[in-house]
Amino acid sequence: GKTIQVIPHITDEIKRNVKLLGNKYKFDFVITEIGGTVGDIESLPYLESIRQLKWELGKDALCVHLTYVPYLAAAGELKTKPTQHSVKELQSAGIQPDVLVLRTEHELSTTLRKKVALFCNVDENAVVQSIDAPTIYEVPILMQSQGLDVTILKKMGLPVGDTPGLGPWRAFLERRHKAEETAPLHIALVGKYDLQDAYKSIREALSQAGTYNDRKVSVDFVNSEKLTDENVAEALKGMAGVLIGPGFGERGVAGKFVAIKYARTHDIPTFGICLGMQCIAIEFARNVLGYADANSREMDEKTPHNVIDIMEEQKSITNMGGTMRLGAYECVLQKGSKAYEAYGTEHIQERHRHRYEFNNSFKDAYEAAGMKCVGINPESDLVEICLLYTSPSPRDYAAS
């Protein structure tokens, strides 16, 4: 019966979520990132929650503040005022950062570090440089070279011990550097979202896959909204593979169909994720099975050939918030399939975020035409992975 207030109700819930992992599992550290900019109104409840947590946990909590040190090319000088101002704002919220990590394009001098330490009220060895790196994978090595790990351990009163060699990580970086020297393998990422962070995990996954196969991978974005029968050949020219990206809604889907058809008829390996897999299934139904009006219920509720349909348990849901099929679900792979070869095991788990699934009513027709359903959820019998066999090796690889 109480009135919900930002303090204490919202802040208490934020604190509960921050402490959740630490209370539930045996972790040495739990890292929580508060994004945004200090001073923004949206971040105020989170900053207050952090202030309270710091007070409650004492030395068991440590605040690391990331700031940007701009470089004025005209003056040839790094400016620390933005960092000083940011820390002042943080202090006004009741938080004294323990460590400052300064993003910079140029090396920070000892004099500049002392200046920042003095005016931001932190130890000099707690001012850590984070210089621009070629890839994000270089950052842990750079942070270790700056002594960030030792600084954190000392400030939390924990034994320092021997410095880890990070052998596997360094080996990965060395392999990555060698892979970057090879001729690039071009992969077309077909999607509709202009903000490339929407596909960040896909880009990184392809990049890592390239490293482990000793080959540089160049991911070339292709805007599906601008893709037509007239320009698709030029857009996909020289591509070693095509990835049809995930998404929601009908916008940009027509262009995905164009890309899928071109890739299928020109023997270009194609991989569809989520909506991308559904688009591959729809294009196959239209142009191979002969269902010209095949579609997803998401795009056309009245289509008689709803090869992609809303999940049965989703049909009665009216509140769309947080009710999708979310998180990791089990998938059993068909032995001998390309998917089984890729994973090296029969039982896998992959994350999901959708309401629509392959309609099993059409399963026999697909398999008779060469598209095999090789990954099935054992509980719901939902199709998770399809493979199109049209040549000695499977070509279209569509994963839900």
Predicted regions: what is each one?
Residues 1, 320-324, 346-349:
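Conserved N-terminal/central alpha/beta ligand/cofactor-binding core
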Residues 128, 218-222, 374:
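General small-molecule cofactor/ligand-binding pocket signal
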Residues 335-388:
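Catalytic beta-strand/loop cores that center a nucleophilic Ser/Cys/Thr
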Residues 235-330, 336-338, 400:
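Cysteine-nucleophile active-site neighborhood
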Residues 389-394:
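Conserved small/polar residues in nucleotide/adenosyl-binding loops
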Residues 1-215, 225-241, 248-249, 256, ...:
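Flexible phosphate-sensing "switch/lid" loops adjacent to ATP/NTP-binding sites
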